[in-house]
């Protein structure tokens, strides 16, 4: 009794200490709107409302945790001084439930913060008293804690019953408090600055200004404590042991979650949940536009931008926009030249991880994607998808300008440049322009003579990968492409497409100069050089020039004496494939070229052309000496020999 009276007198003597008791609830700092008022707010105002309300709730939780730390310290101090101090009661009241005054938009945010705060309290509850234990030597704070001070967890209702004079005494009296000021007072005040001005106003009006000047000073000093959890690897410190454990994963590369199916390991539970869907095939997120399903919500969000056309990610260098952030990151490497993904086998680097994975299949020879129709295997999933179209005949990519259809999107994009006139890739040697960088790279090998693709069987090298693939079929004899009309087989898809035009009589390529039509683009390009006189292919031995690379290749064999084409019947060899084909008709008796006038057949196309001049009376070969004309070149040569003999006789 004497001690209580002395305490009461000492309180009365100190000015500003006799403050009224009361409680502060979330309702006191909440800004309430009716449903009608809420509907009048625009999205920006609603977002601001949620941010302010959530900040006030955080501040009250901050005060709650800090006052508990003060009470624990007061109890510890009592073990040394012997004073009996009632630190007051701190409670949460269930009367102020979220649903009483909060809209559904706020519930989710506050519940989420409540869960995070519980995690913080559970993992780091010992931390606030760490510094005080060192000063007081106390080992058991729970023995001195008041039974009524344990907070009751509720969803939202937060109240404080505090005897403020005792709190003020806690601040001003005792050596331990001074030691605490010296050890912790130098820490940053940023945490207390986060308390909103509105919350300070409410507290000041309800309890008086001394509460802010006394209690919050101690709250600041206690909460801005040292970080007791330090990493032995790098020395980085954390407030809570859970954060330290998560940080250790970056050093040890440990993974907490392992897939039971494939053994892959992950450091977060949500990642393994996503990964499991790869095995189960579960796709829970569905697009309302096209019905396509996805395993992750983020994938669905990116997919929706295909329908809306939204491309929120913009390159600062060239202004190009993208629908995905990862696509922008990969695009930026084109400007920086960065290639962070390196092959361990050959040291080649790539700008994308997917490109590295595809490249590794070259070394391993792995082809995990198999066609169910013909059993052919592929190293890339996209290649298998394109291959499937060969069986179905589907061409899903259509040009809006001319209705041309294509198997691949890249082919369509390349075709569109014909309409736009775009030709951004220019050869520095001959100024020729191309629609893609791959075409330019292939063209430049004409000037450099580079042939990087080599056959493992015979050692022959090629400037194009497609040419090497075609050459391989000569060794294997494989001809996977069959004509449905006549059953003829081909080793290349392009050859089958060209062959189909023979049945259809289609000749889509037309010369603008003479209106002559062709079934192949290469034939049209070769024909155009007749009008322009261009002969870009030059022999390095005799400097003779030719209109096509095939003509140059045939001519080169004149110098080398090479005759790679052999007849299976008589073993006769030839330096040109066309001559071999003509020779083989001698054995087979085949005469595929027929005259429409008289029905006569020939085994060579040139023989048919010469015969048709008999019906047309055309004589295109003219002698420069006497002006006489002939139907065939051989006849002209024979005639010119007569003039030569006369000149010899005159001499």
UniProtKB/Swiss-Prot annotation:
Record key words, sorted: DNA-binding, Metal-binding, Nucleus, Repeat, Transcription, Transcription regulation, Zinc, Zinc-finger
GO cellular component, one term: nucleus
Source organism superkingdom: Eukaryota
Annotated GO MF terms: DNA-binding transcription factor activity, RNA polymerase II-specific; RNA polymerase II cis-regulatory region sequence-specific DNA binding; zinc ion binding
Keyword Repeat belongs to the record: yes
GO biological-process terms attached to the record: regulation of transcription by RNA polymerase II
Domain KRAB: 24-98
Family annotation (InterPro entries): KRAB, KRAB_dom_sf, Znf_C2H2_sf, Znf_C2H2_type
PROSITE patterns noted in UniProt: KRAB, ZINC_FINGER_C2H2_1, ZINC_FINGER_C2H2_2
Subcellular compartments: Nucleus
Pfam assignment, any one: zf-C2H2
Zinc finger (C2H2-type): 227-251, 257-279, 285-307, 313-335, 341-363, 369-391, 397-419, 425-447, 453-475, 481-503, 509-531, 537-559, 565-587, 593-615, 621-643
Function (record text): May be involved in transcriptional regulation.
Family recorded in the similarity comment: Belongs to the krueppel C2H2-type zinc-finger protein family.
Protein name: Zinc finger protein 816
Organism: Homo sapiens (Human)
């Amino acid at each position: 009794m004497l001690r209580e009276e002395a305490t009461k007198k000492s309180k009365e003597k100190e000015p500003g200490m006799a403050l009224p008791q009361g409680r502060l609830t979330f309702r006191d700092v909440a800004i309430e709107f009716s449903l009608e008022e809420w509907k009048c707010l625009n999205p920006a105002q609603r977002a601001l409302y949620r941010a302010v309300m959530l900040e006030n709730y955080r501040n009250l939780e901050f005060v709650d945790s800090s006052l508990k730390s003060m009470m624990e310290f007061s109890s510890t101090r009592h073990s040394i001084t012997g004073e009996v101090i009632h630190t007051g009661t701190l409670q949460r009241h269930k009367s102020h439930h979220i649903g009483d005054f909060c809209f559904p938009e706020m519930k989710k945010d506050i519940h989420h913060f409540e869960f995070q705060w519980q995690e913080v309290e559970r993992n780091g509850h010992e931390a606030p008293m760490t510094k005080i234990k060192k000063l007081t030597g106390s080992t058991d704070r729970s023995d001195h804690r008041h039974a009524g001070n344990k907070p009751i967890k509720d969803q939202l209702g937060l109240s404080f019953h505090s005897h403020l004079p005792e709190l003020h005494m806690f601040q001003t009296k005792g050596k331990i408090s001074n030691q605490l000021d010296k050890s912790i007072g130098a820490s940053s005040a940023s945490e207390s600055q986060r308390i909103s001005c509105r919350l300070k106003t409410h507290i000041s009006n309800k309890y008086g200004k001394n509460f802010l000047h006394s209690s919050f000073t101690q709250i600041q000093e206690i909460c801005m404590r040292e970080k007791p959890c330090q990493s032995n690897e790098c020395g980085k410190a954390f407030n809570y042991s859970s954060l330290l454990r998560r940080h250790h994963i970056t050093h040890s590369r440990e993974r907490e979650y392992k897939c039971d199916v494939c053994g892959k390991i992950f450091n977060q539970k949500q990642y393994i949940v996503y990964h499991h869907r790869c095995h189960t095939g579960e796709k829970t997120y569905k697009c309302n536009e096209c019905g396509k399903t996805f395993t992750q919500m983020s994938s669905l969000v990116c997919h929706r931008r295909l329908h809306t056309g939204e491309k929120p990610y913009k390159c600062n260098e060239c202004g190009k926009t993208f629908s995905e952030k990862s696509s922008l990151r990969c695009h930026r490497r084109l400007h920086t030249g960065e290639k962070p993904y390196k092959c361990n086998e050959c040291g080649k680097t790539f700008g994308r991880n997917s490109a590295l994975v595809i490249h590794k299949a070259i070394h391993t020879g792995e082809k995990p994607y198999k066609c169910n129709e013909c059993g052919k295997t592929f190293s890339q999933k996209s290649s298998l998808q394109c291959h499937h179209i060969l069986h179905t005949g589907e061409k899903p990519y259509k040009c809006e300008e001319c209705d041309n259809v294509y198997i691949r999107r890249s082919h369509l994009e390349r075709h569109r440049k014909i309409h736009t006139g775009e030709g951004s890739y220019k050869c520095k040697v001959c100024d020729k322009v191309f629609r893609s960088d791959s075409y330019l790279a292939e063209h430049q090998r004409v000037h450099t003579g580079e042939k990087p693709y080599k056959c493992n069987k015979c050692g022959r090298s090629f400037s194009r990968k497609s040419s090497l693939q075609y050459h391989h079929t000569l060794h294997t004899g494989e001809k996977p492409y069959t004509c449905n009309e006549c059953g003829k087989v081909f080793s290349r898809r392009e050859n089958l497409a060209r062959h189909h035009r023979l049945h259809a009589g289609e000749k889509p390529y037309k010369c603008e100069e003479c209106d002559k039509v062709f079934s192949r683009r290469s034939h049209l390009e070769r024909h155009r050089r007749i009008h322009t006189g261009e002969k870009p292919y030059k022999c390095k031995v005799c400097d003779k020039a030719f209109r096509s690379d095939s003509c140059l290749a045939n001519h080169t064999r004149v110098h080398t004496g090479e005759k790679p084409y052999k007849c299976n019947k008589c073993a006769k060899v030839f330096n040109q494939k066309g001559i071999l084909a003509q020779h083989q008709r001698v054995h087979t008796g085949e005469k595929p070229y027929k005259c429409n006038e008289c029905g006569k057949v020939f085994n060579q196309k040139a023989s048919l052309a010469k015969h048709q001049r008999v019906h047309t009376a055309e004589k295109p070969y003219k002698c420069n000496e006497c002006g006489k004309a002939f139907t065939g070149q051989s006849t002209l040569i024979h005639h010119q020999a007569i003039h030569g003999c006369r000149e010899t006789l005159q001499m």
